[in-house]
């Protein structure tokens, strides 16, 4: 259910701002989006898994806060990221 290390490394490589970057807002949002997508698939099959549902809501809230922060500090990076990830905003 969780992302494999290979998938996470691929996401980090794609969204990193420089070599060795694992903590930038873009990388964090991209990894959270992949986690959220996997949890959404899990929840569609397991509707009564309430602990996973709570984890999904926490991840969505964390991503929302990171996106709000990015929008406040740099609108161009924010718009690039949401278009690249295909998020509605």
Curated annotation (Swiss-Prot):
Signal peptide: none annotated. InterPro entries: Ribosomal_uS15, Ribosomal_uS15_bac-type, uS15_NS1_RNA-bd_sf. GO terms for molecular function: rRNA binding; structural constituent of ribosome. It holds the Pfam family Ribosomal_S15. CDD domains: Ribosomal_S15p_S13e. GO terms for cellular component: cytosolic small ribosomal subunit. Disulfide bonds: none annotated. SUPFAM superfamilies: S15/NS1 RNA-binding domain (SSF47060). Coiled coil: none annotated. Keywords: Ribonucleoprotein, Ribosomal protein, RNA-binding, rRNA-binding. One of its GO terms (biological process) is translation. Belongs to the universal ribosomal protein uS15 family. One of the primary rRNA binding proteins, it binds directly to 16S rRNA where it helps nucleate assembly of the platform of the 30S subunit by binding and bridging several RNA helices of the 16S rRNA. Part of the 30S ribosomal subunit. Forms a bridge to the 50S subunit in the 70S ribosome, contacting the 23S rRNA. This is Small ribosomal subunit protein uS15. It comes from Oenococcus oeni (strain ATCC BAA-331 / PSU-1).
């Amino acid at each position: 259910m969780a992302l494999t290390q290979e998938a996470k490394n691929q996401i980090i490589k794609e969204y990193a701002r420089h070599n060795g970057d694992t903590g930038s807002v873009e990388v964090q949002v991209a990894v959270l989006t992949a986690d959220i997508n996997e949890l959404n698939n899990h929840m569609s099959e397991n509707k009564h898994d309430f602990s996973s549902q709570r984890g999904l809501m926490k991840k969505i809230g964390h991503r929302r806060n990171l996106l709000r922060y990015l929008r406040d500090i740099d609108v161009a990076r924010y718009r690039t990221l949401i278009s690249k990830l295909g998020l509605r905003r």
